[in-house]
Amino acid sequence: LFRSSLYIAFTGSRFALHSSDTVAIEMGYSKKPIDDMLMFHLTFGKSVQDVSLNAIANLGYAEMSFPNPVYVGDTVSMTSTVIGLKENSNGKSGVVYVHSIGVNQNCEEVLNFKRWVMVHKKDQTTLSGINEVPTFAKTTPIADVINIPTIKTVDTDASGGKYFFEDYVAGERLNHPEGITIDNSDHTLATKLYQNNAKVHFNDHMMKSTPMGQRLMYGGIIISTARAISFNGLQNAQWVYAINSGAHANPTCAGDTVYAYTEVVET
């Protein structure tokens, strides 16, 4: 519960499902589940020590799904399997591809995703020629049975929005009006909350000698910020089913301001 409250403090997320037991129960849940992105960060953080502690940057994601909701009191663990390696042309670093699966205390899958991260090479004088790049599905298939309750009605006064599936059109663009500035203090506390100890986010002394010259903000902060901003226009998009693909296209540093828009690709 403490983590859920802090997550709202860090992101300003306003989605009703994760904010109110009353709304969650009306929607068929036993109580409010924790925010899908908070669950992602908490689970993702478990993989950092083994995969990306010394990473140059986390580059992207594919085939991310959230098969089951997570509630306060659940225990989540994660395993990761290396599925590909690609040496960069400079011979000093390479990209590691991993498949990570998070499960709860009942061994029920709560998170499944693939990601790729750029990591320094131990031997930077010898070219290995390793080039084993996995392929990824373009979209995450819609399951025949989706593990969410049957929702009979949604209180639009409580959710804050009146727009539903039928109101969105492929090709439509939603310009969310807000911008949020990323603060060093919020980033530091949030990333520590997620137990993500990647050096690029915390070691300012080390980062001053890099081309960036300062700490990089954890990319998940940007994902959560964009999701929170999307509330204006997507108020009833209460649950994240999947993320087909994603990339950290540019680094973010303290003081940067994040804006977001949404394009409806398909309905």
Label for each model-derived stretch:
Residues 2-59, 121-140, 145-243:
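Hot-dog-fold acyl-thioester-processing enzymes
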Residues 7, 61, 76-80, 96, ...:
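Short, structured motif recognition centered on aromatic/hydrophobic residues
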Residues 57-68, 82-84, 239-250, 265:
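A cross-kingdom feature marking solvent-exposed beta-strand/loop segments within repeated
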Residues 54-56, 70, 90-92, 236-238, ...:
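Generic marker of residues within folded, mature protein domains
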Residues 43-44, 64, 72:
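Long, hydrophobic/aromatic-enriched structural stretches that serve as scaffold segments
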Residues 68-153, 254, 261-267:
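HotDog/MaoC-like acyl-thioester-processing domains
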Residues 2, 82, 180-181, 186, ...:
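A broadly conserved detector of short glycine/acidic/proline-rich loop/turn motifs that flank catalytic sites
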